[in-house]
Structures are given as structure tokens and as C-alpha cells.
């Protein structure tokens, strides 16, 4: 459950990466046919902030019905926060983390069974992302807040005994738009998420078995 970097938005603005490129699809390939990855990426999605210019981007409004649509799930992967750094929201990293907590709590309330949780702190916004010719919705303060998210998200993960991954340690934003993952970033992130899930013990009882099982993972 994420934003444009889960959707697979291309940095050059020409649409969406194909299923051979998106990290969600590569993760599906890593897990194989015995497991099912559910893609829930939406461009512009935030944790709790309503965007007056783009309808339906508030993750808190969508997570409940999304969980109900796909119940039962075994693992929820959350990667949100980049759009919360936009200047019009004027949010600190602590505020964004509090928004993430609200999303998690609502997901728990709407789930038909307990699920494991993996929190991913998103890649950093690139230097100069708000410069002329790039994305005017961000500025230098946005860049700084994006760099502070990992510290706050790690605290949230610890509170929920959840898995945690700092995507900024794995990939950089494309130089084309200073905001979105490129092909190599998607590949690196898919491998890192797979490793985190398998090596941290998330879904361990379902992954290390001799017969395939249905594994629903909302990403």
C-alpha cells in the first residue's frame, strides 16, 4: 500500500513501468506462484492529508476498504510519506509518522485476521527536486523532512514489532525527476524487500514449507 513509487510511475512522465520492471511484480517473481502480491499503489497518496488538487489521495480514507476488499491478508507492506512532504501540508517527520500510525490502526480494525507488518521508509527526495523544471510541490524543507522519516518510522516499527526497511539505503531517486525510482531502483528495492521478509522472520511459517500456499501481501 503506497504511492507513485509503488504504482511504478516512470520518472520521465511517460506513464507506468511494466510488470517486468515494477518492484511489486519483481517481488511476486521472487516469491513464486505459491504466493500472491497485491499491488495497491496510487500516485499522490498521502498518509492522512487531503489534497485539494487531487481527489482520493488520503491513505487513511482508503486503507480500510482496501483491506476489506482483499481479506484475509497475511502481511501489509506500507511505503508512504513522500507526498506528505509537499509544501502545502507543511508537515514534520513526526507528524507524518503519526499519520502512518493512524493508517496502521485502521488497517488492523478492518482486517479479518491479525497480519504481519513491514514498514518501509521511502527513498529521499533528490537534491533540488523543487527547482524549476522539476516538481514545484516540493522545496528544500521537503527534502529535509524526507531525510528525517526513517528515524521516525523506525520508532513506529519498533512499537508494532514490525519489520522495517529504509529504502533510502537501497535506492536513489532518478536524476530525471529527482523523485521517482528508475528501473535499477525498482530491482534493488524488490530484492531488499524479499530479503527483509524472509530473513526477519515475517511470514516464516508460510515461506519455508514444502507445499505452496496462498500468501496475500498488500504492497
Which role does the model predict for each range below?
Residues 42, 203-206, 210:
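Short, flexible loop/turn segments with low-complexity composition
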Amino acid at each position: 500500500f503506497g504511492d507513485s513509487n509503488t504504482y511504478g510511475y516512470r520518472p520521465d512522465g511517460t506513464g507506468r513501468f511494466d510488470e517486468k520492471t515494477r518492484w511489486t511484480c519483481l517481488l511476486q517473481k521472487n516469491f513464486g506462484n505459491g504466493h500472491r502480491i497485491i499491488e495497491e499503489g496510487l500516485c499522490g497518496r498521502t498518509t492522512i492529508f487531503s489534497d485539494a488538487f487531487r481527489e482520493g489521495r488520503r491513505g487513511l480514507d482508503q486503507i480500510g476498504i482496501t483491506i476489506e476488499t482483499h481479506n484475509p491478508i497475511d502481511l501489509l507492506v506500507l511505503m508512504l510519506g513522500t507526498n506528505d512532504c509537499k509544501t502545502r501540508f507543511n508537515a514534520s517527520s513526526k507528524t507524518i509518522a503519526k499519520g502512518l500510525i493512524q493508517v496502521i490502526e485502521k488497517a488492523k480494525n478492518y482486517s479479518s485476521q491479525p497480519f504481519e507488518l513491514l514498514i518501509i521508509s521511502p527513498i529521499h527526495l533528490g537534491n533540488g527536486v523543487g527547482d524549476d523544471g522539476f516538481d514545484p510541490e516540493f522545496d528544500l524543507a521537503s527534502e529535509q523532512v524526507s531525510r528525517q522519516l526513517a528515524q521516525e518510522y523506525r520508532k513506529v516499527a519498533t512499537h508494532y514489532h514490525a519489520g522495517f526497511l529504509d529504502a533510502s539505503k537501497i535506492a536513489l531517486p532518478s536524476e530525471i525527476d529527482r523523485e521517482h525510482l528508475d528501473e535499477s531502483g525498482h530491482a534493488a528495492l524488490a530484492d531488499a524487500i524479499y530479503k527483509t521478509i524472509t530473513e526477519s522472520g515475517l511470514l516464516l511459517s508460510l515461506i519455508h514449507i514444502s507445499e505452496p500456499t496462498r500468501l496475500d501481501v498488500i504492497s
